[in-house]
Amino acid sequence: MKRFLQFCLTLALLLAAIPSMAAVTVRGTVTDANGEPVVAAGVVEAGTTNGVVTDMNGKYTITVKGADSVLEFSCIGYETQSVTVGNRGVIDVVLEVATSFLEEAVAIGYGTQKKADITSSVQSVKSEDFNKGAILDAGQLIQGKVAGLQITLPSGDPTSSTSVMLRGYSSLLGSTAPLVLVDGIPGNLSTVAPEDIESIDVLKDGSATAIYGTRGTNGVIIITTKNAKRESPATVQYNGYVSASHWLNTPDFLTADELRAKWAEGWTGKGDISEDRKYTTDWLKEISRTAISHNHNLSIMGGTQNHTYTANLTYNDNEGTIKGTGRTNIRGRVQIAQYLFDNKLKLSAEVMADENNSKTGFNPGYTYRQACIQNPTQPVYIDNDPAKGYYETDGYFYDNPISYLNERIGMRRSRNVRFNGVAEFRPIEQLTFKALYVRKGQSSIRGNYNTHKDVSTTEQGLNGTASRGTSELVNDLLELSANYQQDFGNHHVTAVAGYSYDETTYESFSMSNQNFPTDAYLYNKMQAGMGLTEGTSSQESYKYNTKLIGVFARATYNYADRYLLMASLRVDGSSKFGKDHKWGYFPGVSAGWRLNNEEFLKDVKWIDNLKLRAGFGITGIDVNSPYQSLASMNYSGYAYVDGHWNPILVPARNANPDLRWEKKYEYNLGLDFAFLGERINGSIDFYRRDTKDALYNYSVPTPPYTYGSMMANVGHIRNQGVEVLVNAVPVRTRDFEWSTSVSFSYNQNRLISITPPKGSELSLSTNYFDTGYTGEPIQTSTHRVKEGWPIGNFFGLKSVGVDEAGKWVVEVLDEDGKVSGYDYAENANSSDWQILGNGVPDAFANWNNNFRFMNFDLAITMRGAFGAQALNFQKLFYGNPTIAYNVLNSAFDKIDVVDMTTGKPTGKTAVISDAQRYVSYYIEDADYWKIDNVTLGYNLRFKNAKILKALRVYGSVRNLATITSYSGLDPEIRTVYGDDGAFDPGTDDRDKFPTIRSFTFGVNLTF
């Protein structure tokens, strides 16, 4: 009986336990902070597809697996909450309103401001919206993301960086690059690893950038890095990827078989292309490869109540698609912060360091050109035997490209170190004092050596040539500022004032030598070359020091979240300008009106934000080089005095005490909007910016001046345009979400004036200047910059066709610039030149889409440029069958034969049989639309895991597809002018490192 009773008791206990292991039904109500029911909120059992939605009263009922189940409560506009069921049958939840994007803090320079309160043209991009894949620098992260910000990388060179221009050309001699700040400190787009960036804010109009004075004309890009938060657990993240790249397109030059077929058809060719040398060589294949690159980023961060720490290390090996090219980079960053005296004092210190190593022995673009034009029937080596040396001929500018790869050896190593310390003291809640000190050091060393086998040395009978150079830059920055904010009822006021001292010292040394006893020394034993004793070596050194001192202030006012005002002033002093104009004054002012908070719109619930903005600001442009206001002298020629030849010192630059800032005056009118719970938001901006006192070089009389030209402030440039941005979330459900962003920008540029005022000693022979250059053998300019014209105009002969013999026929102009007849291009002169197009796009458009389905995400970035033309240099030089090099297949295209009297087509066609000539036939429309970046990812989170918290794997394709009518390799062509200051946008250089397409596989791990 006892055993029976024990059995019954055990059975009863087991039966009693069954309900706790069975399904559990939970009921409850979901409300907001005001106690109002949240309708259609999702209630989901975590890790399953089991879910329900709340009814009109916010009530729900759901059956889950058991007590260990976790319920997730979510709704658009609210923060998601997770609750473990336990032994409860009723669970009521209060959802907190999600942080509005209008409440997000945006960096505006020397502080932050709520997006809703901003009265200037500012756009912010967060890390979750960055482009993915094999990203070169911060510029590529936001390429296609910011209206009006033109970011291009029209080169596959692994040592290149993105070119950036905002709202058009603002200077004739100055840079177009925006000021880049990394955590408030001047830097560049490569200062930090892309994986280490939290957000990027772009200040676009003058009212926003005026507080940066001389450095703010071209806009300001503010990069904020990822840093630990207080009381956050230690987190370790690894981000890595492997990428394979190849040329986007390959030019269609004749292969060996095609060349032999042309000979068989009766085409004889000229020079090096006229003889069958019995081999078959794919020269482009010989110099190229599929490039494999990899990147690894490791970071750790965490914090307690009183301190935070952040550390990261990145290694990048970027291999080039042309053999022998590549770059490796290693960089690290450590940041610590300590909070003292009840958080009244914050001390932080940061060290950043990086090292870049690249191969620079040969010019990859010129090597690519040589590979294009080589005879495909000739071998790489004599008799195809490397021991016998390279196969070379006596062709003009015609060298074996494999010789360049193997016999031109070089390196460049640069190291950068940045230390900064910050002290922030807050005696009261409303007032903060800040002191920032930064010291940056940059050093580089470079060396190049051409062996005794290189064509440049064999032609000159030399035993190797070498060059070596070093440079060092040290920058010190001190900034002291005070920040105040206070609320007085409906009045909110902020103010910041400060002082900035920025000093830079740069020095460099370089030398060259030749005739070395052995190639083994390379560039490492410069004294061994005989050029030192033969008098053929060279040495050069340089040093400069510049100072920039600034005092700045800004105040903002907000009344009842309706009326907004901002005013700023910066006073800058620069050592680069004349003694009478060292200082410049740069004010900015803007205002905003939030209509949605007015009584007449308060009841319109679908409007979340509707704000009118207007702003005006003046910014300055510093000259690129120091000492331009001072006279200088150089040696030129020799004089025979007292039996010796002595070098003669001659004037090289006039003193100009009136040299001063270029000033940009910018007006901006904008509208910010957000509708339907912020699911639709964006902005519209109209702007006009006038650069006055633009610097240019003018002729001056001698005497009284000692030199015949002088830089002076005379020019006037105007840009005006519109920018539109629309963000939307068309679909958002528990399992699927689609967000999209569309932006459009249009800019009109014009050179208003460069003519000196009447009575001035300055003079110009014309109101224009020609720029750009075709190179050998055409040797002519490609562009004209003229008063009243937009910058970027192609200028040359307009072709209408050819005659029956294949000679170019062009328009002839009368004195009024109108067509008066037709003639052969060889008979035309510069008076027949006319505008042939413009290399700067009128408009840019971007369309970004992000999709999420369950744990998958898909990002598609598309962008395009419209209204520009391009000069197809490859077609200009090699689309002609009369040259002595290999040619493009298009060289044999049939062109319309025209009547020499009317210029109209006769119905006949002919192949070109004329010298290479710069005519409009080679200028093409360059509109394009690119599917630029496609990334597919899969995400996993491990909530209860002790080690691995999250995993993401992804695949990405960059430069996937291009829609264009342009016949060249890539219609995305440099529009930012080069370091030489040439305004020649739209020139598709024949020496350009080919654009690449890359395929990337990556993984992100969070521990």
Can you annotate each of these PLM segments?
Residues 1-340, 345-354, 418-419, 707, ...:
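Short, small/polar-rich motifs associated with maturation and membrane association
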Residues 12-23, 79, 359, 677, ...:
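Short hydrophobic alpha-helical membrane-anchoring segments
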Residues 130, 177, 291-294, 329-330, ...:
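Extracellular/periplasmic, surface-exposed regions of secreted and cell-surface proteins
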Residues 208-209, 283-287, 654-656, 834-835, ...:
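Short, P/G- and charge-enriched loop/turn segments at secondary-structure junctions
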Residues 246, 251, 256-266, 353-392, ...:
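A surface-exposed, glycine/aromatic-enriched loop/edge motif typical of exported proteins
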